[in-house]
């Protein structure tokens, strides 16, 4: 058996958390449920005002989150976005206060790539010493912007053991890159991953990458998992991206002729943010349960064993 650690991402339950005033589902509910389900760690989106799914921004709240994961024997990762130094220094300290060992980020610069690359290198070089001092690993995600080779170029230039890569199973589709090409380029740097499933569809708003329950899309999720394991990855994170939708950023003529870019059923188009609150919550629960079951089944079929003790 191939031993791994298995995290789950709070994006999977984003509507439960967003509408917590009515669902009663907060970060502590999430931590408790995912521990009971057998995950060995939790990832929490902490973007924006109030730190989103973290559900609080005080020192007391951070301490309570730290205690909640420790009591259940879980590892914790936090997500932020925007590599600017002010944000990164703050979020590294938040991660450390919460007991997180990893902080994910991606760039939010709205500028030509020739400018964004050196700015991102500058930012990550500047914050790396603080992250190292506080024991927080920084991971830069291929998040709808950089191709695999560009991300590898950035991390090569940063040249810090405290700054690695997060590989997303499907985000390269938005920039017209086959996920395996992105994986090959990023492989020497990958420390964390987001496991999800997508289809590419035509919509009235243009070509879109559509999130679907795990196992219902066109991503080669089993082979991707095997390739990542062979590259040394031992911590995987399941992310339910049902009803996620993002535009394809390149002309369709430039899309690779690989199976994950075969056009899917336009009827799958769904933007969860446009659904009524109750419907979003109910359908998210079904998608999460079905997708998580498919993910666990895929792992078992391919010889993976989730270990309760930390693997990496």
For the regions a language model picked out, list residue spans one by one.
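Histidine-acidic metal/acid-base catalytic patches
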Residues: 1-21, 35, 148-163, 173-312
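Active-site-proximal loop/turn and secondary-structure-junction residues that shape catalytic pockets
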Residues: 12-14, 46-48, 82-84, 107-111, ...
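Charged helix-capping and loop-helix junction motifs
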Residues: 22-26, 57-64, 89, 93, ...
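Catalytic domains of carbohydrate-active enzymes, especially glycoside hydrolases
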Residues: 25-48, 98-102
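Active-site acidic/histidine proton-transfer and metal-coordination neighborhood
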Residues: 32, 60-164
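Glycine-rich, proline-tolerant flexible connector loops at the mouths of alpha/beta enzymes
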Residues: 40-67, 111-112
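Conserved beta-strand positions in the central sheet of alpha/beta enzyme cores
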Residues: 43, 77-78, 103-104, 194, ...
